[in-house]
Amino acid sequence: MLRQFIVSTVGRRLQLPMMAQSRLASNLDKTEYTTPGEIVDYDDPPHLPVPEYPVRPDEPLETRKQRLLYQSRKRGMLENDLLLSTFVAKHLKDFNAEQTAEYDQLINGVSNDWDIFYWATDTKPTPPQFDTEIMRLLKEHVKNHEKVQRIRQPDL
């Protein structure tokens, strides 16, 4: 069947159905609005309520680290899942209570995960309240000087 199709279309222009042509044309129109490498980042609408993350002052350090390990692996976007889970596997066990609180504030105090990604990759400047020792450590981790493959999350 495929051989017949190839033979029958050689030397002829392949005609797309009318519906496919209009869909293709509408997709071509959309490409003129962005340029390659441009970040499309819109502000949140003012009517969108962003809930405050609850502070847990009485949470034991080990429980907090376990929660952060889980939250670093389940971000909802693969890019941050890979970056944060490998970062936590490497550094979280050595964090003291203050560093753990800084990391908790970093991943739970931000309302948009793309912000964490852009700050960690130095695509956008990090705001002063998040420019901490932990963010600098994360930025170094993202640079991947050791050239470690990070195509999957580390085992638990």
From Swiss-Prot:
Primary residence: mitochondrion
InterPro entries found in the cross-reference section: SDH, SDH_sf, SDHAF2
Localization, UniProt: Mitochondrion matrix
GO cellular component terms, semicolon-separated: mitochondrial matrix; mitochondrion
Key word Nucleotide-binding present: no
Transit peptide segment: 1-24
Keywords: Chaperone, Mitochondrion, Transit peptide
Gene Ontology biological process terms from the UniProt entry: mitochondrial electron transport, succinate to ubiquinone; mitochondrial respiratory chain complex II assembly; protein-FAD linkage; tricarboxylic acid cycle
Superkingdom classification of source: Eukaryota
Record-stated family: Belongs to the SDHAF2 family.
HAMAP family: SDHAF2
Function comment: Plays an essential role in the assembly of succinate dehydrogenase (SDH), an enzyme complex (also referred to as respiratory complex II) that is a component of both the tricarboxylic acid (TCA) cycle and the mitochondrial electron transport chain, and which couples the oxidation of succinate to fumarate with the reduction of ubiquinone (coenzyme Q) to ubiquinol. Required for flavinylation (covalent attachment of FAD) of the flavoprotein subunit of the SDH catalytic dimer.
Assembly description: Interacts with the flavoprotein subunit within the SDH catalytic dimer.
Protein name, per record: Succinate dehydrogenase assembly factor 2-B, mitochondrial
Organism from which the protein derives: Drosophila melanogaster (Fruit fly)
